[in-house]
From Swiss-Prot:
Protein name as it appears in the record: ATP synthase subunit b
Entry GO MF terms: proton-transporting ATP synthase activity, rotational mechanism; proton-transporting ATPase activity, rotational mechanism
Annotated function: F(1)F(0) ATP synthase produces ATP from ADP in the presence of a proton or sodium gradient. F-type ATPases consist of two structural domains, F(1) containing the extramembraneous catalytic core and F(0) containing the membrane proton channel, linked together by a central stalk and a peripheral stalk. During catalysis, ATP synthesis in the catalytic domain of F(1) is coupled via a rotary mechanism of the central stalk subunits to proton translocation. Component of the F(0) channel, it forms part of the peripheral stalk, linking F(1) to F(0).
Predominant location category: membrane
Pfam families to which the protein is assigned, alphabetical: ATP-synt_B
Cellular component per GO, a single term: proton-transporting ATP synthase complex
Record field: transmembrane: 11-31
Annotated family: Belongs to the ATPase B chain family.
Native source species: Haemophilus influenzae (strain PittEE)
The protein's assembly and partners: F-type ATPases have 2 components, F(1) - the catalytic core - and F(0) - the membrane proton channel. F(1) has five subunits: alpha(3), beta(3), gamma(1), delta(1), epsilon(1). F(0) has three main subunits: a(1), b(2) and c(10-14). The alpha and beta chains form an alternating ring which encloses part of the gamma chain. F(1) is attached to F(0) by a central stalk formed by the gamma and epsilon chains, while a peripheral stalk is formed by the delta and b chains.
Topology with respect to the bilayer: Single-pass membrane protein
Amino acid sequence: MNLNATLIGQLIAFALFVWFCMKFVWPPIINAIETRQSQIANALASAEAAKKEQADTKNLVEQELSAAKVQAQDILDAANKRRNEVLDEVKAEAEELKAKIIAQGYAEVEAERKRVQEELRLKVASLAVAGAEKIVGRSIDEAANNDIIDKLVAEL
């Protein structure tokens, strides 16, 4: 193999090209690659952190939702309990009012019965005196008439 000047010139040109590339071209490319690798690593770490944060947030939301459901159920239970208490109070008041109205009605009926009975006694006594006057054929004085009516009313 013959080494001639062209081959040596090409070797020197190639060596200069490699040196130039290693000195001026290669470092920016390596820096760009390393920067890109770090950006990708940061993005992956950030994505992983976001995924973990999303899972934590989801768990927190589920816990708050279940707590809200429990609280809502407690509120409903309390409302139902209060409703039942109010219904019981209203029923008791209605029963008291009913009993009072019935008692008042019985008292009114009893008073009316006594009034009618007394009125009937007085009419019967008056009729008895009128009948006795017709039978006797004479009129009794007013004081004696009232005395007889009072005695008849007391006996009836």
